[in-house]
């Protein structure tokens, strides 16, 4: 089903070869709580990063909607972590195909370590419990600015990570590789128009990042996909 697109915006941003100068930008920090509107009013949860001296450049960048890649250092206790050990009685955890692939790869590495290093299952579980987390990559779309619809007086960086999560991740480390600009901020006549535009922004991000010049190599290759050419090593190092 096609999404509303009253302004006839394109689904693809930038050339197929990849981001153009001055992109990509980098940003990192711990996820903080925001205005509390993303999930409650919009149904679009956001993970906010502080606009501080560590990310001073963001104070002067044009306000608007950007897109790119996010990496989250989810602890082993988080249900969406590739290191997560699901309790026998727990409910199924929602995972998108990328998360499933990353978890399968980690499980294969764990099994290989057990076979090669002689690590028993009890000891392996202990090692996983002590793990502080592992960087996992997701596409993202983000707003930088004041959000005219809500008349914010404080400049913010609100990130919508394009994935399904079974729990929040406040306090988790997040890194962003911002690859392009989608559109300017604008005011809306009503909440529905704002939500429709955000959903279309997400589709723009998904389509644009699916091209090999925009896809980070560190994601690996799934069946039917081309290997990415964009250097995303900073996201996971």
UniProtKB/Swiss-Prot annotation:
The active site is at residue 158. It catalyses: riboflavin + ATP = FMN + ADP + H(+). Its EC number is 2.7.1.26. Pathway: Cofactor biosynthesis; FMN biosynthesis; FMN from riboflavin (ATP route): step 1/1. GO terms for molecular function: ATP binding; metal ion binding; riboflavin kinase activity. Residues 99-115 have a biased composition (Low complexity). Residues 1-23, 82-126 are annotated as: Disordered. InterPro entries: Riboflavin_kinase (IPR023468), Riboflavin_kinase_bac/euk (IPR015865), Riboflavin_kinase_dom_sf (IPR023465). It is an enzyme of class 2 (transferase). Its cofactor is Zn(2+); Mg(2+). Keywords: ATP-binding, Flavoprotein, FMN, Kinase, Magnesium, Metal-binding, Nucleotide-binding, Transferase, Zinc. Zinc or magnesium. Belongs to the flavokinase family. Catalyzes the phosphorylation of riboflavin (vitamin B2) to form flavin mononucleotide (FMN) coenzyme. This is Riboflavin kinase. It comes from Neurospora crassa (strain ATCC 24698 / 74-OR23-1A / CBS 708.71 / DSM 1257 / FGSC 987). The lineage of its organism: Eukaryota, Fungi, Dikarya, Ascomycota, Pezizomycotina.
């Amino acid at each position: 089903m096609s999404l509303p697109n009253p302004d006839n915006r394109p689904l693809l941003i930038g050339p197929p070869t990849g981001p153009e100068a001055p992109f990509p930008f980098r940003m990192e920090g711990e996820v903080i709580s925001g205005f509390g509107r993303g999930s409650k009013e919009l149904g679009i949860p956001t993970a906010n990063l502080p606009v501080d001296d560590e990310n001073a450049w963001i104070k002067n960048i044009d306000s608007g909607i950007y897109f790119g890649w996010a990496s989250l250092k989810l602890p082993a206790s988080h249900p969406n972590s590739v290191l997560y050990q699901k309790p026998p009685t727990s409910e199924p955890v929602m995972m998108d195909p990328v998360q499933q692939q990353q978890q399968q790869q980690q499980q294969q590495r764990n099994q290989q370590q057990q076979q090669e290093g002689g690590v028993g299952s009890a000891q392996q579980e202990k090692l996983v419990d002590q793990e502080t987390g592992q960087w996992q990559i997701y596409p993202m779309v983000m707003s930088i600015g004041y959000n005219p619809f809500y008349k914010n007086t404080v400049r913010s960086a609100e990130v919508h990570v394009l994935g399904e999560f079974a729990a929040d991740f406040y306090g988790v480390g997040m890194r962003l590789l911002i690859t392009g600009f989608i559109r300017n901020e604008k005011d809306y006549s009503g909440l529905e128009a704002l939500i429709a535009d955000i959903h279309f922004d997400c589709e723009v991000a998904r389509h644009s990042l699916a091209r090999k010049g925009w896809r980070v190599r560190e994601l690996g290759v799934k069946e039917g996909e081309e290997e990415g050419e964009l250097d995303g090593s900073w996201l996971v190092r």
